[in-house]
Amino acid sequence: KFTWNPRNVVLSGQGTAQFIENGKLKYVPYHRLFREKKMVNILNEGPFEMYANRDSLLYMDVYGLSDIPNIIRGTLRAVGFCEAWDALIQIGLTDADFPILNSGNITYHELLDAYVDQYNGGTLRERVAQLLNKPANSTVMDQLEWLGLFRKKKIKHNFATPALILENLLREKWTLQPEDKDMIIMQHEVEYIKGGKKFLKISSMKLLGENGHETAMSKTVGLPLGIFVKLVLDGKISARGVQIPVMKEVYEPVLRELENEYSVIFNEKLTVL
């Protein structure tokens, strides 16, 4: 469900991702991004899907990693998400570049039909399955059905882009309820050589929200900034001007307070390879 800007969720990934793997630059354009997912095992949580997140190369100079053979930043999603989201992309429902004429007077069924009119015969569900090269009884098709894309219900948004229509439809399904609890997961995997031996260090963090208002997302986004501002006001940060938090005098006290006061904790596992 949504715990941050819904529009950003719908438009996420709409730029070529770039990273380095085995010493080579890799580029993944938007139309392939969710198809080229990787499986990642999260410490104590099991498998998740990961797709490359924009420009991983930005972090090389910031962290002094200009000569490493592998660097990739990814977004984690539950297993099955990437295939379903790729279906929305292939249909064309994440396009934010053009308004659909008379969109306020057509149904979701009619909208989807306009995308697959060239496919002959069968129900709308069967023709969408042809477009996606999926069985009509596949899980992805069930997910599109659950979302409400086959309903003969009016969209009721005039001159809306496909992305806006999708966003509003997702808001119906993905709005946090008061009793809901979100979950944030972050994991770093670092391979390095020390003393002639190769190691893998995994540092993993999981945080659950309290309810639909006090979310894990709001804590992990808001608390670091709040702690930093307090440190500045207390005169404990000497840096001046616009800074990013990669200095020890910033990240050490912030991480320490996050762990001690708010249970934002990274667990680590070290393995000899």
Question: Where are the predicted features?
Answer:
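C-terminal catalytic/substrate-binding lobe primarily of soluble NAD(P)-dependent oxidoreductases
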Residues: 1-273
